[in-house]
From Swiss-Prot:
It is an enzyme of class 6 (ligase). This is Argininosuccinate synthase. InterPro entries: Arginosuc_syn_C, Arginosuc_syn_N, Arginosuc_synth, Arginosuc_synth_CS, Arginosuc_synth_type_1_subfam, AS_cat/multimer_dom_body, Rossmann-like_a/b/a_fold. Its EC number is 6.3.4.5. It is found in: Cytoplasm. ATP binds at A6, Y7, S8, G9, G10, L11, D12, T13, S14, A33, G114. It comes from the Bacteria. GO terms for cellular component: cytoplasm.
Length: 395
């Protein structure tokens, strides 16, 4: 058999290439998804080859990731436990789908990942692959091998001449893509202490951000951001540029003591500058273009959608149905939002939607231009209170 391994270029998966090859006496195909991570992907490819991979596939999936995974989550307003914008969990079903596709193309009988037994990712990969290809074996070398610490993995790499580019002093576990960065482990496990300043990877500390606000405009068409400050951009460029601007202003930092899939709580800090601003802007625009009942109901699905993503239940009818629901409303989410970025805060200060906006200044005005029928309001209040009034009689 041959094995297709989800390869990141880090310690775990670099050791896994060699370990899988030796353990199963088979070829290991290393698959690395370009999701906009910071690493030098050419160096990552060379590292996989040096570790023993028979083939290395590096694939640019940034556009696919944004359009098919990040934007649907944005449309749903998904934030796990009200905070986490899910950059890493959103990438896992995409990686799993590509692993399955490559395994079928190459005739491989197994796929593998570098997740640990106590982490969320091993559940996400297992669940996604089982949903797509139950006939494939799913290998988890980090769970199966005899190495029990980061130090023992480094020692294994040294014994076998595997260059992993890390040391025992590396304090954090970091996962980065174009939608955001997650940071765990190290001193972050001391939950009664503030995160060390060096834990944050891409955002400026709000107190050190510029002393003058940065004002930007974001244009949406059918729910998708298409322009920044009046300039039409493809989605990759828009998210990248917005992310740089927001990060420089200290936007997108989140700290959460989250409830993991496997049953215990862990502390993570997350940076999602572009996603934070886009969610604020899209939510603000929805308030302008959606009627009250639709707006309130749509916001009620945000937690459920976030849980589906976090739990690894991407390939479910429920997630697809929620996407269809959001897509039905998306055409109205067309307009422009002005956002002020200042020392960690993204504040929507203006919005317009000439075609779908539901705001009427003539109705909302309390001055002479007021066109609201006040006598009708009094009658409405009487009818609105009737259920409560009648209840008093029967109680």
């Amino acid at each position: 058999m041959s094995i297709v391994l989800a390869y990141s270029g880090g310690l775990d998966t670099s050791v896994a290439v060699h370990w899988l090859k030796e353990r199963y006496q088979t070829e290991v195909i290393a698959y690395c998804a370009n999701l906009g991570q910071i690493e030098d992907l050419e160096a990552v490819s060379k590292r996989a080859t040096a570790a023993g991979a028979s083939e290395v596939i590096v694939e640019d999936v940034r556009d696919l990731f944004l359009h098919d995974y990040a934007i649907p989550a944005l449309a749903a307003g998904a934030a796990y436990e009200g905070k986490y914008l899910l950059a890493a969990p959103l990438s896992r079903p995409l990686i799993a789908e590509r692993l399955v596709s490559i395994a079928r193309e190459r005739g491989a009988s197994a796929v593998a990942h570098g997740a640990t037994g106590k982490g969320n990712d091993q559940v996400r990969f297992y669940t996604s692959v089982r949903a797509l290809a139950p006939e494939l074996d799913i290998l988890a070398p980090v769970i199966d091998w005899e190495m029990t610490s980061r130090g023992s993995e480094i020692a294994y790499a040294d014994r076998h001449g595997i260059d992993v580019g890390v040391s025992k002093t590396t304090p954090y576990s970091i996962d980065t893509n174009i939608w955001g960065t997650s940071i765990e482990c190290g001193d972050l496990d001391l939950i009664d202490h503030a995160p060390p300043p060096d834990a944050w990877q891409i955002t400026t500390a709000p107190v050190q951000a510029p002393d003058r606000p940065t004002t930007i405009t974001i244009e949406f068409e059918a729910g998708i951001p298409v322009a920044l400050d009046g300039r039409k951009l493809d989605l990759i460029d828009l998210v990248s540029e917005l992310g740089d601007t927001a990060a420089a202003n200290g936007i997108g930092r989140t700290e959460i003591l989250e409830s993991r899939i496997v049953g215990f709580k862990s502390r993570g800090i997350y940076e999602a500058p572009a996603a934070t601003v886009l969610l604020a802007a899209r939510t603000d625009l929805e308030a302008l273009v959606l009627d009250r009942e639709t707006l309130h109901h749509k916001r009620s699905i945000a937690d459920q959608y976030a849980e589906l993503v976090y739990y690894g239940y991407w390939f479910t009818d429920l997630r697809a149905a929620l996407d269809a629901y959001c897509a039905r409303l998306a055409h109205r989410v067309t307009g422009t939002v002005t956002v002020e970025l200042y020392k960690g805060s993204a504040r929507c200060i203006g919005r317009t939607s000439p075609k779908y906006g539901r705001y009427s200044s003539a109705l909302a005005d309390y001055e002479e231009a007021d066109t609201f029928l006040h006598e009708a309001g009094a009658g409405f209040a009487y009818c609105w209170a009737l259920p409560l009034t009648e209840g008093v009689v029967t109680r």
